[in-house]
Amino acid sequence: MFNRVVLFLLTNFAVLILAGIVMSVLGVNPAQMSGLLVMAAIFGFGGSFISLLLSKFMAKRSTGAQVITEPRTQTERWLVDTVRRQAQAAGIGMPEVAIYDGPEINAFATGANRNNALVAVSTGLLQHMREDEAEAVLGHEIAHIANGDMVTMALLQGVLNTFVIVLARVVGGIIDSALSGNRDSGRGFAYYIIVFVLEMVFGLFATMIAMWFSRRREFRADAGGAQLAGRNKMIAALERLSLNHGQNTLPSQVQAFGISGGVGEGLRRLFLSHPPLTERIAALRASNGTAM
């Protein structure tokens, strides 16, 4: 947690420096932008952290996941016991364990912190994966929690949101002034249209950055799953996923934390939260099952 706080502070410091440079280049006095920066930070980080705090509730509600409070079957008992064992090995609190109805082979983890998380698997995973493969998938999700990926993604998204809000308004103000001949007549309707368009454009670039980080995060979670369950099991699980052609039924807010992501070529790959399965398998085969 301390490392993520340091990363958060350093990232914000870097963003402030970059914002100051951008404003200087554009001829904007940063001292006049303090109100905008505060507003942008409140909205940028506020939305991200509200989503993080509500992530378990929203995930359970949107997927219909049923938390296992008292195991009723051998499969449920195995799930709970495996998650407990892996959580202890990873040094995190025992997550809630749930099953949701979905035909695809998938699982996800979410939660506000390492000791208040949820691990859920699809019925399709339980039907189509062997026990050793499912163990590796659970290890992958436990690694996400142990690595603090949900918190880190929220911090990153907050920084990106803040930067998009500020930059869109700074650039929008400059364009509006140029179009109006620098007349000091206040902000017109055109300014808000320009800001809206710029937020969409800058938001696309911000999404690319967030998804790039998410793809790096998946490789690390694969390595963590290999450490907890075994590299061969993790490879076998990903190979099984590569044969899964079912539609991803996970809601968009939790898809980034599933074991299985979308597929795409060309520019579409820049917006994917998961690397291609072939690359993930190759990375595991080239590794030595290093730590999370």
Curated annotation (Swiss-Prot):
**A biological process term (GO) from this entry:** proteolysis
Which Enzyme Commission numbers does its entry carry? 3.4.24.-
InterPro entries from the xrefs?
HtpX_protease (IPR050083), Pept_M48_protease_HtpX (IPR022919), Peptidase_M48 (IPR001915)
Pfam families recorded: Peptidase_M48
Alphabetical GO CC annotations of the entry are: plasma membrane
Mark the transmembrane ranges.
5-25, 34-54, 155-175, 193-213
Tell me which positions the record assigns to the signal sequence.
none
Q: What's the protein called, per UniProt?
A: Protease HtpX
Q: Gene encoding this polypeptide? A: htpX
